[in-house]
Swiss-Prot record:
Cross-referenced PANTHER family: MULTIFUNCTIONAL PROTEIN ADE2 (PTHR43599), SI:DKEY-6E2.2 (PTHR43599:SF3)
Pfam family, one: SAICAR_synt
CDD domains: SAICAR_synt_PurC
Taxonomic path: Bacteria, Bacillati, Bacillota, Bacilli, Bacillales
Enzyme class: ligase
Similarity-based family: Belongs to the SAICAR synthetase family.
EC number in record: 6.3.2.6
Pathway(s) annotated for this protein in UniProt: Purine metabolism; IMP biosynthesis via de novo pathway; 5-amino-1-(5-phospho-D-ribosyl)imidazole-4-carboxamide from 5-amino-1-(5-phospho-D-ribosyl)imidazole-4-carboxylate: step 1/2
Example GO biological process: cobalamin biosynthetic process
Disulfide bridge positions per record: none
Protein name per the record: Phosphoribosylaminoimidazole-succinocarboxamide synthase
Amino acid sequence: MSLLYEGKAKRIFSTGTSDVLRVEYKDEVTAGNGAKKDFIEGKGRLNNQITSRIFNYLKAKGLNSHFIEQISETEQLVNSVEIIPLEVVVRNIAAGSITKRLGFEKGHTFETPLVEFFYKNDDLNDPLITEDHIKLLQIANDGEIEKLKEAATEINEVLVNLMDKMNLRLVDFKIEFGRTNEGEILLADEISPDTCRIWDKQSDTNFDKDVYREDTGSIIETYQTFLNKLEAL
């Protein structure tokens, strides 16, 4: 098995099967598009276990992803997909960049979930783009854009209900999708506190990577508490 790709949080390896890949979660955490970076032992284990549980939960609700199975504390097998270079962001509550970009007060609840697209390009700092931009860049066509929006909205509905059972609020999250060789679009990458903004219902305490971004707590303790809540369901 050979290393195919190494990103900020994961390594991707080939397997003996052409359409199956092995993903290894790293003990690294970054913020600000890599401007802040640290090695934190145990983080890979937590992200792998959380993502595996959430992908299995989504599958049970009829929402498929590239995920096949967890094979170790830090590894999982996934179906090979060509990643679509978009971050699909769903916002239920105003926080983060949208408060600066559009002036919403932090904590403002949107009447309906807001779906945004960001172009995955480190050199351009992952800019917000429109549906017309997506077509102009030949990233996806009209039908695929609608599928991405519909899938993101369905995933959001399931995750909001899941977090509610954990006494948490899903503020926002970002997800990625990929195409199979047959052209099917599947949820890919990960869903974890690295990719979500999650608040405690009573205290608004963060259960996500903001504790690292803002130096307000231990990322390991925060993620472990989140996993404990997930396992308790």
